[in-house]
């Protein structure tokens, strides 16, 4: 078996990244850089391909429990801890521009933050970004958990929080653990109920984002709000 050190420079993941950028690398090559080394008889790129095949995707590998992660050949508790640290740093990096007092100036940045924050959750969460009159962030607040439907989402509770924080506008968001960001009819009904309730206190709902795996659906962009 050819060892990784014997590969041409342009085919080694680290050298390829430096020459062509991160977008040029496959999932297996990116994972290989994270793992750094393979195991007996298996180079790190081959090991990465095997792990992706076993888990099904990078998303599934990242979301794996400690026990499921550590039982795989070539992994272990040290790698699990390292991965969790990387994921948390990524989340904080995306969240930093969306901290209290900063204005929302980019829809893409907002989506990236919400996807990073919510796409791995194994249960549904209904939340909102509360904004002041200049669309500066007051806070991100999680309202409801579990199966999200008209019976569990109460516009009155959202209105109370909005009033207590003196918010002028909000962006609604909830996740679909299935990974499918498509908005259901129930999602649209809930949104309309909240929009109607907040109109009574002169608070605008700027958007409702449905977060799936690596992407989200915007009610505003689809003309549903």
UniProtKB/Swiss-Prot annotation:
Biological processes annotated in GO: proteolysis
Gene Ontology terms for molecular function: metal ion binding; metallopeptidase activity
PROSITE patterns noted in UniProt: MPN, UPF0758
Binding positions for Zn(2+) per the UniProt entry: 174, 176, 187
Highest taxon of the lineage: Bacteria
The entry's keywords: Hydrolase, Metal-binding, Metalloprotease, Protease, Zinc
Signal peptide location: none
MPN domain ranges (all copies): 103-225
Family statement: Belongs to the UPF0758 family.
Protein name, per record: UPF0758 protein Ping_0056
